[in-house]
């Protein structure tokens, strides 16, 4: 290790004590807020400790370090208080007086401590008022508006409620449960787990999986139709599942949903145009046939010849 150079100030301040050269500068040097105090201090003697800013107990009281080990005397209760009135400090003489509490510890720990009898009297008055209001109410106003509306819908009156007359059953006797249809049938169409009765209106049984599948409706049906169109379009373009093809990505529904949807709409429009054109051509053919039929020779119309006239003509012209 290289020996550190000692400054001139350190040599002056350390005539009697040797300076430890191994102490770093950030420990040895005084901070900026201590240097001003050191210059103004009266005990700025020649023989000063260069590590005095680290000492807890010193002879000179230039630097005050907070030491919690030593006992301290508090300032005590002040009789004068500073009050700011219109941006000016003024002192007010005052004496802090403690309130005399006549109640002892047992009184303060009592369960009814701080509770007055006047509050309970007010509660009793409220209860009496509520009882009087209930007694003064008539039978018509006893029911709430929501209850009255519900009773009107059910066709009931307050007298019916008193007599406990039950309304007619909402469900008819002819309305039987769906699972009762399987009692005398060989096949079970009711699934108790899904609570679904298998019928042709709701769905059909798949031949491959032998499972009952519901008929798709709404967006599910549209997505299924679009998936079928994507598969057919891929087959038309020569793409197969067993072969590896880079163009296969362009015909996948998940990768190109909007593209295939637009393509399907375009093909539907083209098919509509073709059907319209075919219908027009058929109408033209029918019109041509009608014109040709009008131009053909018509059978003569007149009175038929009698047998005598026919015989005379045969004799004359052979």
Curated annotation (Swiss-Prot):
<keyword id="KW-0747">Spliceosome</keyword>
<dbReference type="GO" id="GO:0000974">
    <property type="term" value="C:Prp19 complex"/>
</dbReference>
<feature type="region of interest" description="Disordered">
    <location>
        <begin position="1"/>
        <end position="22"/>
    </location>
</feature>
<comment type="function">
    <text>Involved in pre-mRNA splicing.</text>
</comment>
<dbReference type="GO" id="GO:0071021">
    <property type="term" value="C:U2-type post-spliceosomal complex"/>
</dbReference>
<dbReference type="InterPro" id="IPR039974">
    <property type="entry name" value="Splicing_factor_SLU7"/>
</dbReference>
<dbReference type="GO" id="GO:0000386">
    <property type="term" value="F:second spliceosomal transesterification activity"/>
</dbReference>
<feature type="region of interest" description="Disordered">
    <location>
        <begin position="274"/>
        <end position="318"/>
    </location>
</feature>
<dbReference type="Pfam" id="PF11708">
    <property type="entry name" value="Slu7"/>
</dbReference>
<dbReference type="InterPro" id="IPR021715">
    <property type="entry name" value="Slu7_dom"/>
</dbReference>
<dbReference type="GO" id="GO:0030628">
    <property type="term" value="F:pre-mRNA 3'-splice site binding"/>
</dbReference>
<feature type="compositionally biased region" description="Basic residues">
    <location>
        <begin position="285"/>
        <end position="301"/>
    </location>
</feature>
<dbReference type="GO" id="GO:0000350">
    <property type="term" value="P:generation of catalytic spliceosome for second transesterification step"/>
</dbReference>
<protein>
    <recommendedName>
        <fullName>Pre-mRNA-splicing factor SLU7</fullName>
    </recommendedName>
</protein>
<feature type="compositionally biased region" description="Basic and acidic residues">
    <location>
        <begin position="1"/>
        <end position="21"/>
    </location>
</feature>
<feature type="region of interest" description="Disordered">
    <location>
        <begin position="37"/>
        <end position="62"/>
    </location>
</feature>
<feature type="compositionally biased region" description="Basic and acidic residues">
    <location>
        <begin position="274"/>
        <end position="284"/>
    </location>
</feature>
<keyword id="KW-0539">Nucleus</keyword>
<comment type="similarity">
    <text>Belongs to the SLU7 family.</text>
</comment>
<comment type="subunit">
    <text>Associated with the spliceosome.</text>
</comment>
<keyword id="KW-0508">mRNA splicing</keyword>
<keyword id="KW-0507">mRNA processing</keyword>
């Amino acid at each position: 290790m290289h020996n550190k150079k000692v400054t001139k100030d350190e040599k002056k301040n350390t005539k009697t004590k040797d300076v430890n050269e191994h102490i770093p500068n950030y420990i040895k040097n005084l901070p900026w807020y201590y240097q001003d105090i050191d210059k103004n201090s009266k005990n700025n003697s020649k023989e000063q400790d260069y590590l005095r800013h680290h000492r807890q107990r010193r002879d000179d009281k230039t630097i005050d370090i907070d030491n919690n080990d030593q006992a301290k005397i508090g300032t005590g209760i002040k009789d004068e208080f500073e009050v700011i009135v219109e941006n000016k400090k003024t002192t007010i003489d005052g004496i802090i007086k403690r309130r005399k509490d006549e109640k002892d510890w047992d009184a303060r720990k009592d369960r009814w401590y701080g509770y007055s009898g006047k509050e309970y009297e007010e509660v009793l008055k409220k209860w009496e008022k509520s009882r009087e209001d209930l007694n003064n109410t008539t039978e018509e106003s006893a029911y709430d508006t929501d209850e009255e509306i519900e009773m009107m819908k059910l066709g009931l009156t307050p007298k019916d409620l008193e007599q406990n007359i039950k309304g007619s059953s909402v469900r008819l006797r002819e309305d039987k449960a769906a699972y009762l249809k399987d009692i005398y049938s060989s096949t079970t169409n009711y699934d108790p787990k899904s609570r679904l009765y298998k019928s042709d209106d709701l769905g059909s049984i798949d031949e491959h999986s032998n499972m009952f599948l519901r008929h798709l409706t709404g967006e599910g049906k549209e997505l299924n139709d679009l998936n079928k169109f994507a598969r057919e379009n891929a087959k038309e373009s020569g793409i197969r599942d067993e072969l590896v093809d880079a163009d296969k990505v362009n015909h996948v529904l998940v990768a190109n949903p909007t593209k295939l949807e637009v393509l399907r709409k375009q093909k539907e429009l083209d098919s509509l145009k073709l059907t319209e054109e075919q219908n027009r051509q058929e109408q033209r053919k029918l019109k041509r046939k009608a014109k040709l039929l009008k131009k053909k020779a018509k059978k003569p119309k007149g009175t038929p010849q009698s047998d005598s006239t026919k015989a005379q003509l045969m004799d004359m012209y052979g």
